[in-house]
Amino acid sequence: MIKRENDLQQCFFNDTLQTVDAAVFDAVSGELRRQCDEIELIASGNIVSRAVLEAQGSVLTNKYAEGYPGKRYYGGCHFVDRIEELAIERAKNLFGAAFANVQPNSGSQMNQAVFLALLQPGDTFMGLDLSSGGHLTHGSPVNMSGKWFNRIAYGLRQEDQLLDIESVERLAKEHKPKLIFAGGTAYSRIWDWKRFREISDEVGAYLVVDMAHIAGLVAGGVHPSPIPHAHIVTTTTHKSLRGPRGGMILTNDEVLAKKINSAVFPGLQGGPLMHVIAAKAVALGEALQPAFKDYAAKVVANAKILAENLQNNGFTIVSGGTDNHLLLVDLRNKSLTGKHAELALERASIICNKNNIPFDPQLPSITSGIRLGTPAATTRGFAENEFIQISDLISEVLDGLTIAKNDDENFLVEAAVKKKVKNITDNFPFYS
């Protein structure tokens, strides 16, 4: 009996996922094949290093560590304290911030922590409208931020689809918000952080910058940093920063840092995910290496190549181009919706997402555009030649869809492009 119990115990500790749960193993294996065989152009997507995967899949999953380094509510935390301190110091060094909280479990929770720290329910704040490239947590009516607080939306100029900074100033003076959110998820141009801070100071508002999408570009020195201008900066640790899925909050203000720490724990979260914090530490360490600057520069260069070649192929790019890692394609001149374009491209192994364009007449579930991004494909090693090919393959699929009477009629085009995609991806393996 004892031997049988010991055998069962050893099985628990040593049996692999494939042995224990074939259904989950098959799905994970399928996802790996999908990632290897398809071209990932979702702007918020990326591919982490094996070291990041190893840290996140480590024994730290077992460790509960409520509190902060040196001030835990559980014993046995000396190793996880060291890991969290590494993550904090690396975040501060990478972005030039005096304080960093690396515990938020997600981008939504990091922004919720800011609201909890700085606002009371019913307070007024400003954020970029979702249809102009903002985020749900910047005051969308369907999100907590839009339900609990009075959000005043700002947007883009219709004539050039650039940020309407004059409108931001006018609305701020009119509504006197306590907080102004800058940053977004689908704006392809450079943000003027200095001007936002000037407007915030004029009305006595906190300036909070959500740089989740561009954090890797800021770290790599190819996008201006908001740290010298914002009261608080929030960012995810995935996307262009190429780390695990999670959030982080930065500031140079000690008083605000204490408020943020209290808002994250115990305000919103209990025990932090130490395996994820370890993976954050690894990714931040990678971003501190000289090679990351080269990576960030390539991400932007590849986005510009993709935008330029799509324009040459007759596609309309919102605002005329891009300064960062993403671009929005307006499909109205092709008589296509974003929904149909996304599905057709996926059938051809090119992965993107439908996305509203500024002043979009279509519903968010349909959209008039698609959003494309270069971080993941650049991580794989794709360069100028590959992105020229990708732009041509996108054009083949979508021009075929324009001509076809229905999705089925574009099948041969999509199948041919799928083979061409496989020829490209076979030359750029990962996790081998």
From Swiss-Prot:
Site (Plays an important role in substrate specificity): H238
InterPro entries with a match to the protein in the record: PyrdxlP-dep_Trfase, PyrdxlP-dep_Trfase_major, PyrdxlP-dep_Trfase_small, Ser_HO-MeTrfase, Ser_HO-MeTrfase-like, Ser_HO-MeTrfase_PLP_BS, SHMT-like_dom
Main location as per UniProt: cytoplasm
PROSITE patterns linked to this entry: SHMT
EC class (word): transferase
EC code(s) of this entry: 2.1.2.1
Recorded superkingdom: Bacteria
Record's catalysed reaction(s): (6R)-5,10-methylene-5,6,7,8-tetrahydrofolate + glycine + H2O = (6S)-5,6,7,8-tetrahydrofolate + L-serine
BP GO terms, sorted: glycine biosynthetic process from serine; tetrahydrofolate interconversion
UniProt modified residues of type N6-(pyridoxal phosphate)lysine: K239
Function: Catalyzes the reversible interconversion of serine and glycine with tetrahydrofolate (THF) serving as the one-carbon carrier. This reaction serves as the major source of one-carbon groups required for the biosynthesis of purines, thymidylate, methionine, and other important biomolecules. Also exhibits THF-independent aldolase activity toward beta-hydroxyamino acids, producing glycine and aldehydes, via a retro-aldol mechanism.
PANTHER family according to UniProt: SERINE HYDROXYMETHYLTRANSFERASE (PTHR11680), SERINE HYDROXYMETHYLTRANSFERASE 1 (PTHR11680:SF35)
Self-association and partners: Homodimer.
Protein name: Serine hydroxymethyltransferase
